[in-house]
């Protein structure tokens, strides 16, 4: 059984009330460690999920990312990705702090290239109403960025691996928006490249989560 920290925990709410923006919490190693371990301490779970978000890559690539109360994620559109890994040092420090105090296996994660790109190129309404016409209209833009983001995702994954995570998950939450051809091109092929890069550094288990992939096409 796995359970990520969140509003079901009073100890989480106590910390959350101190911050206006979740992003501040995602960039504080002490908070990352404490909140990641809250469900483990309360429920005795068999795995710990890193307290973080799939939008850390846009943040480290030049976008302004915020999580205001009651508004959901707000992401400033970017067309050029300048990934600065040092911006995510607080995440790796949080991982190291967790591993120092807990033997519970720690699961790190990242948003896959396709899902990450959606947040960078499209607004909330477009993401919720993603359709073939919108995808076809933006194919060239997407093609131009998928390979670039595949490398960035691989680098961030290895950053987490080097910090000490025990397993890794790749979230492609928007995989179901694609037909079979584009699913293979923008989700499956990039994921295989990311897995290959991770496996070249570590033999940790890797979990793929292509949401609604069975309904794509």
Predicted regions and their residues:
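Compositionally biased, intrinsically disordered low-complexity regions
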Residues: 8, 64, 72-74, 110, ...
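Glycine-rich, proline-tolerant flexible connector loops at the mouths of alpha/beta enzymes
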Residues: 47-85, 165-184
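Active-site gating loops and adjacent loop-to-helix segments of metal-dependent hydrolytic enzymes
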Residues: 16-20, 68-80, 129-133
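Active-site loop segments of alpha/beta catalytic cores
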Residues: 1-6, 87-217
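The substrate-binding groove and active-site-proximal loops of carbohydrate-active enzymes
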Residues: 23-27, 79-89, 143
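Generic signature of intrinsically disordered, low-complexity segments enriched in small/polar residues
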Residues: 15, 34, 70, 80, ...
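N-terminal basic, low-complexity leaders that serve as flexible interaction/assembly modules and, when applicable
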Residues: 1-67, 101, 193
